[in-house]
């Protein structure tokens, strides 16, 4: 079973075109102004057009206001909302009800304690994404190019649908797939030549590494 592959933080038609040609199942646009991958909703909407019907369009937000979500959803018309902040289970339910869109809830992980919140979102969020917790002093909740100990996810038996993120690149993605039950992988900084600058060549290398992975995607965690 092939994993879903999400290329996140896209800002150029060239990177989107290559991601689609290589088989990306999801493309992500980041609406967090402190990120080097930030994009205005109207530009994201234009760039997303070639992807409609080919890949899921994901809007990545961090503790958004209702006005911010209204603008993003109205212009981009995303398939999925990715919540990367401190949104409570109740807030997730409210957002789902308001926009009628599936939600992918992100959890930032460094230790086992960071995963204690997950249970409260089971049956509420449509999918989870596990990312590495930002280093001290960083203003970015994700896209920091660091990984976490994947063995912390060993309690996930495959019944919970999640994507794996956090420092993934061509050199470690095969191990990530072999040692977790992730049904999808999310990459951003791992296909960049500089923060916020996607490299077409690195996108190719990442897909080559996924396609060359020897281990089955649904291998049990360790």
Curated annotation (Swiss-Prot):
Single GO MF annotation: phosphoribosylanthranilate isomerase activity
Domain of life: Bacteria
Catalytic activity: N-(5-phospho-beta-D-ribosyl)anthranilate = 1-(2-carboxyphenylamino)-1-deoxy-D-ribulose 5-phosphate
Pathway(s) annotated for this protein in UniProt: Amino-acid biosynthesis; L-tryptophan biosynthesis; L-tryptophan from chorismate: step 3/5
GO BP field: L-tryptophan biosynthetic process
Protein family per UniProt: Belongs to the TrpF family.
SUPFAM superfamilies in the record: Ribulose-phoshate binding barrel
Annotated EC: 5.3.1.24
Protein name, entry field: N-(5'-phosphoribosyl)anthranilate isomerase
Keyword NADP recorded: no
Keywords: Amino-acid biosynthesis, Aromatic amino acid biosynthesis, Isomerase, Tryptophan biosynthesis
Family annotation (PANTHER family): N-(5'-PHOSPHORIBOSYL)ANTHRANILATE ISOMERASE
Record-linked CDD domains: PRAI
Gene name tied to this protein: trpF
One Pfam family in the UniProt entry: PRAI
HAMAP family linked to this entry: PRAI
């Amino acid at each position: 079973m092939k994993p879903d592959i999400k290329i996140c933080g896209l800002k150029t038609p060239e990177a989107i075109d290559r991601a689609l040609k290589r088989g990306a199942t999801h493309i992500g646009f980041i609406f967090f102004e402190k990120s080097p991958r930030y994009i205005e909703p109207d530009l994201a909407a234009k760039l997303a057009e070639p992807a409609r019907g080919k890949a899921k369009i994901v809007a990545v937000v961090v503790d958004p206001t209702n006005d911010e979500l209204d603008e993003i959803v109205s212009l981009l018309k995303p398939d999925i909302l990715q919540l990367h902040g401190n949104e409570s289970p109740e807030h997730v339910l409210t957002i789902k009800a308001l926009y009628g869109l599936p939600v992918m809830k992100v959890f930032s992980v460094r230790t086992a304690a960071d995963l204690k919140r997950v249970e409260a979102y089971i049956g509420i969020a449509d999918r989870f994404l596990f990312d590495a917790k930002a280093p001290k002093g960083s203003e970015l909740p994700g896209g920091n190019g660091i990984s976490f100990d994947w063995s912390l996810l060993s309690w996930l038996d495959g019944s919970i649908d999640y994507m794996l993120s956090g420092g993934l690149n061509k050199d470690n993605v095969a191990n990530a797939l072999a040692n977790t039950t992730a049904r999808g992988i999310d990459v951003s900084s791992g296909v960049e030549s500089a923060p916020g600058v996607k490299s077409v060549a690195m996108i190719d290398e990442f897909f080559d590494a996924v396609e060359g992975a020897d281990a089955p995607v649904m291998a049990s965690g360790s």
